[in-house]
A protein has these predicted regions:
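Anaerobic metallocofactor- and corrinoid-dependent redox/one-carbon enzyme cores
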Residues: 1-454
Length: 454
């Protein structure tokens, strides 16, 4: 395929003026060989494994960034779900493994380490429960470690016991970091249909079907897409808008493919996937909500928002799929409220509500992300919100998730500051009519008929 000089110039302009970057180069590592009978031995093996395997990740990524002029924002590590390592270890508190991961992450210089995780969509094993019980202490004691728990799949339905357990865990995480605006909750995601090759945090894990070591790359570029849409004629129809987004997504993805292949080659590991997700940052203009407003919605959250987001998501996937044969991960537009300046503005103006975000989740990637809510929100209400997110994922055979942050001492209208890529956000209201009966019923929500694909 011939690349014209003007296309190269366009890509350079995207980088220099519109915040185009590679959001993350994530090294996935298998920790299966680290399992042992003693918690301290597991922690030692985990530290040694990560520092040995990931020692060159940051220097290699930085060298690629310099040589090609492509900003790489984060270098990250994902590991085997830690619950899989502790079955033969009797320790009730397994947070020492998280602390070892955090120390190893600091040693090799990465920004985040994901994989303090468990998959409990059909039932909660003894090791899974110990890991989940350790999440609040683990996230409170670490800076880089992220946790995730899968509670539902289209094939299995929703584990309602796990949903309520995770709601209580979210509350416990908030309490454990109440002096830091519940920051532990920003590092915890509850999933439906979790994927094995997600390079983005906080939900990255290294799945059981992955090789021992693999590079997965997550692209970014909302600012570049917004600029392209804004450059169109005001009279351009939606087909033209979709075509322009598709062409831009292709260019962004080719950049991600280049970085992924080169990083894998230099590190001597497998090239896994390029995640086609558009990931916003708090920087002005680097916003998914700004794209929706450029398409024509007066304010993100207004009527037409879900349609515009569906158009955006579809066009990005189509363009990205032309740019790489290794598309994977979550691959869709992200809508994390605190990380998107235009979304924060929409919440402050009353245009964007939790219920509208739920509708948007049905057509994009993940969904209820980085949402700050009142600290006194009951666990049963949080369980209801998580359950709604899971129901959308189960029914539509897609990955959905909730990253909810009940901030102690804060109420609707207050502001919370997380810093860095996590941004800041106003506290959003939550419908108070959940009650307690539904959340406490327990059991499993049966899988839909659509889950029987064979």
């Amino acid at each position: 395929m011939r690349i014209e000089p003007e296309e190269i110039a366009e890509t350079l302009e995207m980088i220099s003026r519109h915040h185009l970057d590679v959001r993350t180069v994530t090294l996935g590592l298998s920790l299966r060989a680290c399992a042992a009978d003693d918690i301290d031995e597991i922690a030692r093996r985990v530290y040694d494994r990560v520092t040995t395997a990931a020692g060159r990740l940051v220097p290699v990524a930085d060298a690629i960034s310099r040589e090609y002029g492509i900003p790489i924002v984060n270098k990250r590590i994902s590991v085997t779900p830690v619950a899989e390592l502790i079955a033969s270890c009797g320790a009730r508190d397994v947070s020492p493994i998280a602390i070892a991961l955090d120390r190893a992450g600091a040693e090799v210089g990465v920004d985040f380490v994901g994989g303090f995780s468990a998959l409990v969509h059909k039932g909660i094993g003894e090791a899974d429960r110990r890991l989940i019980d350790s999440i609040p202490a683990a996230l409170a004691a670490t800076q880089r470690v992220c946790a995730s728990v899968n509670v539902a799949t289209t094939r299995a339905g929703i584990n309602w016991d796990a949903v309520l357990l995770m709601a209580h865990t979210i509350k416990a995480c908030a309490a454990a970091t109440s002096d830091r605006d519940a920051i532990a909750c920003a590092k915890l995601v509850v999933f439906c249909n979790m994927v094995e090759d997600n390079p983005f945090m906080a939900g990255a894990v290294h799945g059981s079907g992955e090789p021992d070591e693999v590079i997965n790359v997550g692209i970014s570029g909302p600012g570049a897409v917004r600029a392209v849409v804004e450059s169109l004629s005001p009279d351009a129809d939606l087909t033209e808008v979709a075509e322009a987004i598709k062409a831009t997504a292709f260019k962004i993805t080719r950049m991600g493919e280049l970085v992924a292949r080169e990083a894998a080659r230099r590190l001597g590991v497998t090239f896994g996937i390029v995640d086609l997700s558009l990931a916003p940052t708090p920087a002005e203009g680097d916003s998914v909500a700004a794209i929706l407003e450029a398409i024509g919605v007066e304010r993100c959250g207004g009527p037409g928002t879900t349609m515009a987001l569906a158009l955006l998501n579809d066009a990005v996937k189509k363009g990205g799929a032309m740019g790489t044969s290794r598309a994977g991960g979550l691959s869709g537009a992200f809508i994390p409220v605190s990380e998107d300046a235009n979304m924060v503005r929409a919440v402050r103006d009353g245009a964007l509500t939790l219920e509208k975000l739920e509708a948007m989740m049905s057509v994009c990637s993940v969904g209820l992300d980085m949402i700050a809510i009142p600290g006194d929100t009951p666990a049963e209400t949080i369980a209801g919100v998580v359950g709604d997110a899971c129901a959308i994922g189960v029914a539509n055979t897609k990955t959905t998730a909730a990253r909810l942050i009940p901030v102690p001492g804060k109420t609707v209208g207050d502001e919370v500051e997380f810093g860095g890529l996590l941004g800041s956000a106003p506290i959003m209201s939550v419908n108070g009519w959940a009650g307690t009966r539904l959340a406490r019923r327990g059991g499993r929500v049966p899988a839909p008929l659509g889950g029987l694909k064979n």
